[in-house]
Each structure stands twice: as C-alpha cells, then as structure tokens.
Amino acid sequence: MNLLDPFMKMTEEQDKCISDAPSPTMSDDSAGSPCPSGSGSDTENTRPQENTFPKGDPDLKKESDEDKFPVCIREAVSQVLKGYDWTLVPMPVRVNGSSKNKPHVKRPMNAFMVWAQAARRKLADQYPHLHNAELSKTLGKLWRLLNESEKRPFVEEAERLRVQHKKDHPDYKYQPRRRKSVKNGQSEQEEGSEQTHISPNAIFKALQADSPQSSSSISEVHSPGEHSGQSQGPPTPPTTPKTDAQQPGKQDLKREGRPLAEGGRQPPHIDFRDVDIGELSSDVISNIETFDVNEFDQYLPPNGHPGVPATHGQVTTYSGTYGISSSASSPAGAGHAWMAKQQPQPPQPPAQPPAQHTLPALSGEQGPAQQRPHIKTEQLSPSHYSEQQQHSPQQQQQQQQQLGYGSFNLQHYGSSYPPITRSQYDYTEHQNSGSYYSHAAGQSGGLYSTFTYMNPTQRPMYTPIADTSGVPSIPQTHSPQHWEQPVYTQLTRP
C-alpha cells in the first residue's frame, strides 16, 4: 500500500483537476509539456513518479483499483476494456474547444499559470483534502505577494513556452469561446436591422434640429443628385443604391410628411432650389399616387385651417398653404406636400412669408425670376397676382397632369376643404380683382410652363415663419397701398 500512495494521491489530484474546470489545471496538452520539469520548482524532486505517468494512463487507475475489487470483477473489466477502441472517445478538450475536428490548441501558459500548475501539484500532494477552488485562491494570493526576483523563474519559463508554442503553431490565433461570437452575431444583425429602420428617422431628427439654421440642410448633406432615385426625402445612408425598392422611399415620404405637418411653421427641412425635377425618377413620382392622403388630415394644424382670417400675418400665410398651389409648403393636403416632394419646389419657404409681408420690394425682380412653378399664390408679390389668377386654373391643372398624380387632385379634399376646389378650378373671383394687379399680367407667360427654379441668387430671401420671433419680419406697412386685405383674404383662403 505504501508504494501505491503516490499513485492514489496523483489520481485524486487529477480527478480534482478534471472536475474543477474554472481553475487553472493540468490538462491534456500541458501534461506532456516541458513545463513540469522546467518550471523552476522542485516538483520533480519531490515526486519523480509524476512525470513518468501521463495523466489518465489506464494502467495507473487499474493498479490503484486492484485492491478494491475482487479478481473476477477486475478480469471482467479488463476484458471489456480490451475490446473497446478508445480512439472513439472524444477528448473533452476537443469537444469543448472547437466545433471542427482539428484538436484545440491551448494558449501558452503565462507566468502565473506556470507557477500555479507547479505549486498546485506540490500542494495537492501535501494536502490532498484541499478543494481545488480553495487551492486556486491561495495560489493567487501567494502570487501577488511574490517579488520580481521570486517571479523571475516563472516569467522566464512562460517566455520559453511562448516561443516554443509559436514554433509549434505558427498560425495560431487566439479565439475566445464561440458562445460569445454567436451573441455578437445576433446583436450585429439586430443592429443592422435597426440601422435600416431607424436611420431615416434619426436623420430626420438631425435635420429638424438643423433646419432653423439652414433650410438647405439636406442639400448640404447630400447633393440633390445623390438620391435622385428616391423621393427627395431624408437622405438614407450613403451606401444605399439609388435604385432602392420603392418601399423605403414610401416610408421616407410618410415619415417626412409628419415633420412637415407638425412643424408647419418651421422653415422647410429640405432646400429644393438646387434640385431639378428631371432628376426625380418617374417611378417615384408615380408611386406617390398610391398614398392614402386622408391620414394626413389629422396633422393639419388648427391655425392652418382654411377659415383663418388673413389678418394674422404668419397664420394666414400658413393657411394659404392649403391652396392646391401651395403643395410645396405644408401638409396642405398631405397630398400636396407630396407634390412638393416630387417637384422639389423651392420650399416655398414653407416658412411662407406672411403673405402680406410678401416682399413687395421684390416684385420687380420676381417677374423674370418667376419661372418657378407658381405653387404658392401668396408667395408672389402683389404685382404677380393677376398673372397667377389668369393662368392658374389652366396651368395648375396642366401642371398636375404633367406630374401625373391624379390621386392628389383636390377632389380628395372636396368635403373637408370645399374652398380649395372652388379656388383651384374657379379663379373668377380673383380674376375680377385683376384690376389690382393688371400691370404685371404680361409677365405671366413663363410662370408655369417650366419647372426650373430660381437659383439661390435669384430667390428672394424670405423670412421663415419659424423664425418670426427672432427675425424681424417685414412690417405690414410695406405692402403696397393698393393691395387691400379683403383681396388677400380671398387669395389665401382657397
């Protein structure tokens, strides 16, 4: 029995090592490694037998078990074991280490592991009752108390092992457990899907934040041509190809309509002056028709209601936006807001300058520059009302036909905005007032015929409604004396 004591202790220690995975253990690969002999401890002096037996040698267990079982049992066991091919048993390290068939290569031991492995053997030999976890804690405490000179042998051995490991496995790459990588993959997918869904919204919020400073925030972020395949909505991330399926475009449009409607008084989020209607792909325009515009009615701000009297400067301009012509600037019919997207109007500064503030001073320069499709009667200075009035019925309808969004004809709004249909198709009452504006009637020819818009140099600088508090708006007294409020009321209350 005395002879077998070392073997008994050794098997106990190895069983502990196997059962206690979290602690640093002497496992398969390290058992045959040069570390035990070269670890700088006196392990091999105190227990020379240890290195002669690789761990798990079946003979070792047989010897220790021989006195426990009768001979017949031992013979039966040995007979069974002889007939079994042990190569069929998967090595536990390989099973855990990788899903592939190649054996798992362990990391080279660091200095502490060299120390812990050597010391654990000695301590387990001297105190077999110690639990492996307690042993590991103690080894860690002792390691922290060692000074540099005491640690040096372990550090040198660890460096030697590292160099040897590099020679043995030149292309070794440390790969943490696969379980984490699965979680990472899932989170990446989730992030990716969030990216696709959220990015338009996030960009919108950013644009809304920017919009007071620059109404051209989008044209600054992306050149207008960059998204010509999509409606001029919030820019999608640059990687998105132009020819996206129209679904994202539609979502963007819906999302876009909401900020337009809610931020009715804000300056436009999109500056269309640099956008050419030709850049919009026809399929985007045609797809716009499928929108259910009725859902946007709920977003119409109360002060935008057609019935608002024209005397509140800012409010009236906003109410004016509901004219069919005002499609660019407001939720007006949401449908018309879409029209604005289609023919990127200079966002009629949807900041709709209060119509009575409508830049009378610019009337002179607006005449020639008026090629912008007059989509907003109020925006034009009084001198141009006659042209608008006289040409608007035919040309607005013509314009709608060109855009081909029949579903947005104001018939959708017939019930809720009876005045719109009236003012859209029947401008006689405004034409009667043409005497006020007859002097500018001659210039109207180019008004609607072209969809080109004034470049920034030609555009009159409007004061955006959102900034009416900060930016002093043009005093109403500037409006021409002959332009009387009642006429304006008719104009802004389509």
Curated annotation (Swiss-Prot):
Residues 63-103 are annotated as: Dimerization (DIM). Residues 1-66, 159-275, 326-402, 462-494 are annotated as: Disordered. Changing residue 61 to R: Decreases cooperating with SNAI2 to trigger neural crest delamination. Residues 56-66, 159-174 have a biased composition (Basic and acidic residues). A motif (9aaTAD 2) lies at residues 292-300. GO terms for molecular function: beta-catenin binding; chromatin binding; cis-regulatory region sequence-specific DNA binding; DNA-binding transcription activator activity, RNA polymerase II-specific; DNA-binding transcription factor activity, RNA polymerase II-specific; pre-mRNA intronic binding; protein kinase A catalytic subunit binding; RNA polymerase II cis-regulatory region sequence-specific DNA binding. Its main location: nucleus. There is a cross-link at residue 376 (Glycyl lysine isopeptide (Lys-Gly) (interchain with G-Cter in SUMO)). Residues 63-103 are annotated as: PQA. A motif (9aaTAD 3) lies at residues 445-453. Residues 344-353 have a biased composition (Pro residues). Residues 378-387, 470-494 have a biased composition (Polar residues). It is found in: Nucleus. Residues 27-42, 211-222, 326-337, 388-402 have a biased composition (Low complexity). InterPro entries: HMG_box_dom, HMG_box_dom_sf, Sox_N, SOX_TF. The modification Phosphoserine is found at residues 64, 181. Interacts with SNAI2; triggers neural crest delamination in a phosphorylation dependent manner. Interacts with UBE2I. This is Transcription factor SOX-9. It comes from Gallus gallus.
